[in-house]
Regions:
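Catalytic-core regions of glycoside hydrolase
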Residues: 12-15, 114, 125-268
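Short connector loops/turns at beta-strand edges and beta->alpha or beta->beta junctions
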Residues: 45-48, 121-125
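An active-site-proximal structural segment forming one wall of the substrate-binding cleft
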Residues: 94-119, 137-151
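Short, histidine-centered active-site or binding-site loop motifs used for metal coordination
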Residues: 84-86, 122, 222
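Feature activates predominantly on carbohydrate-active enzymes
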Residues: 1-97, 101, 110-114
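C-terminal functional modules
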Residues: 268-372
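Short beta-strands and strand-loop turn motifs
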Residues: 82-84, 120, 158
Length: 372
C-alpha cells in the first residue's frame, strides 16, 4: 500500500445533508481502486458522533462495520482516513475533553483506520480571551493537534478553521499562529484561494505556504452542492491537470459520485469528459443542457454560451420522462427544477402552475410581478 502521506488522491465523504450506507462506501472504494486512487476520507457532517456529539462512543455494530470497511479497503490498496470534529464545543480549559478526544481517536484507530484527521472546519472563532493562558486560537488548535499526535504515537492530519484564503479576514493571524506552532510531521488539508478553487495548481497554496512547510492536501469542492442543493455539478473537471495530493468532496449521491470519479480519471488523462457520461449511460440529450451542470468556474472561462429554450425543454422532457436508470433517479429533481426555472425565466408558467411548485410567499410574489 502507498504511503498515507505522499501522493494522496481520492474521495471525501465530508458534505452536509447526506450520509452513505456501508454498501455505498464499499462501492466507492472499489471505484477508487479501479481508478488507481488510494484514499477514502470519512467525515460526514451529518454523523452526530463525528461532530455534534463527538464525545459519544460509537456502538459495537458501527465499529464492526468500520473495521470491515477498513479491511476491505486495505485489501485493494485504499487507505481510510477518519475525521473527528470537536471544535463546535471543545473546551481547552477542561482536561476531560482532551481525554474524550484521545478515547474517540483510539476507538477509531482500533478498527484499522489508516490515519485520524482532527477537524476545525466550519466552526465559529474560539474566544481565546476566556482561556486563562491567553493563547491565540490558531496556537490552541495547533497545540491540540500536536498533543493528539503525541498521545497516539503517530502522525495525524488536520483541517484548520481557516481552510481557504477567502476565509482570511483583515488582521487575521490564525494561519500564521497555527502553522508556526504545528508540528512539521502533521499534514494539512486546504482548499486553496477559494473554498471552490478554480484550479489545484501549486499557486493555489501560495498564501499558506508563506507560513508552513508542512505537507498539504488539496480539499477539492468543485462538485460539492450541499451549499446549493437545488443544483448539481457534473461538468468537466475544470482547471485540474493532475489528481495528486488532491481529494474530491462531491455530492453524496452514490451513482453520481461514482460517475464523478470516472470523470476525474478520464479528465486528468486528457480524454473527453463525455466518455465518463457515456460509460455511465447518460443519453445524448443531456449534452443539449449540459452547460447548466458545469462547475461554477466554467462560465468564467466560457462567457459566450448559446441558449435555445425549446430545444432545451425538449431535451429535458426526454431526460425526465424517458431516461430511466438509477443515475437518472438521482438527477430527476435537478432536471425538473431546471425545467421549471427555464419556464419561469421564459414566462412559460401560468399562475396555477406557479402556485403548485413554489412556496406560497414566493408564488404570490412571482404572480404579483407577472400581474396575475
Amino acid at each position: 500500500m502507498k504511503s498515507v502521506t505522499t501522493n494522496i488522491n481520492g474521495y471525501i465523504e465530508g458534505y452536509y445533508g447526506r450520509i452513505f450506507t456501508w454498501p455505498e462506501r464499499h462501492s466507492i472504494i472499489k471505484k477508487l481502486n479501479k481508478c488507481n486512487f488510494n484514499t477514502y476520507f470519512y467525515c460526514p457532517k451529518d454523523d452526530l458522533k463525528h461532530r455534534i456529539n463527538w464525545r459519544e462512543d460509537y456502538n459495537n455494530q458501527w465499529l464492526s462495520a468500520l473495521n470491515n470497511f477498513c479491511n476491505s479497503a486495505k485489501e485493494i490498496n485504499v487507505n481510510v482516513l477518519v475525521g473527528i470534529s470537536p471544535g463546535l464545543d471543545y473546551s481547552f480549559l477542561r482536561k476531560n475533553d482532551f481525554d474524550n478526544l484521545i478515547k474517540k481517536a483510539l476507538q477509531l484507530k482500533s478498527t484499522g483506520a489508516s490515519k485520524i484527521v482532527l477537524m476545525f472546519d466550519d466552526i465559529p472563532p474560539y474566544r481565546s480571551c476566556v482561556d486563562k493562558r491567553c493563547k491565540s486560537e490558531g496556537s490552541l488548535h495547533a497545540e491540540l493537534a500536536n498533543s493528539l499526535s503525541i498521545a497516539l504515537s503517530e502522525d495525524i492530519f488536520v483541517v484548520p478553521r481557516i481552510y481557504s484564503d477567502e476565509l482570511i479576514e483583515d488582521k487575521c493571524t490564525y494561519l500564521e499562529n497555527f502553522n508556526k506552532n504545528l508540528n512539521k510531521n502533521i499534514t494539512i488539508f486546504y482548499c486553496g484561494k477559494k473554498i471552490i478553487s478554480d484550479t489545484n495548481k501549486k499557486s493555489e497554496l501560495n498564501i499558506i505556504r508563506k507560513t508552513t512547510s508542512n505537507h498539504i492536501i488539496f480539499w477539492d469542492n468543485l462538485y460539492a452542492n450541499d451549499y446549493c442543493p437545488s443544483r448539481l455539478f457534473i461538468g468537466p473537471y475544470i482547471g485540474r491537470k493532475v489528481f495528486n495530493n488532491t481529494m474530491i468532496n462531491p455530492t453524496g449521491l452514490i451513482k453520481t459520485d461514482l460517475l464523478i470519479l470516472d470523470l476525474i480519471k478520464l479528465s486528468v488523462s486528457n480524454k473527453d469528459w463525455k466518455n465518463a457520461l457515456k460509460i455511465n449511460g447518460v443519453p445524448e440529450e443531456f449534452y443539449i443542457i449540459d452547460k447548466y451542470f458545469f462547475p461554477i468556474n466554467f462560465l468564467q472561462k466560457n462567457k459566450c454560451i448559446d441558449f435555445d429554450y425549446y430545444e432545451e425543454i425538449k431535451a429535458l422532457d426526454f431526460l425526465l420522462w424517458k431516461w430511466k436508470t438509477n443515475l437518472s433517479r438521482e438527477w430527476y429533481p435537478y432536471l425538473l427544477i431546471l425545467k421549471q426555472n427555464l419556464q419561469l425565466l421564459n414566462n412559460d408558467l401560468d399562475c396555477k402552475r406557479i402556485k403548485k411548485i413554489f412556496p406560497i410567499p414566493l408564488s404570490k410574489a412571482i404572480n404579483n410581478q407577472k400581474g396575475d
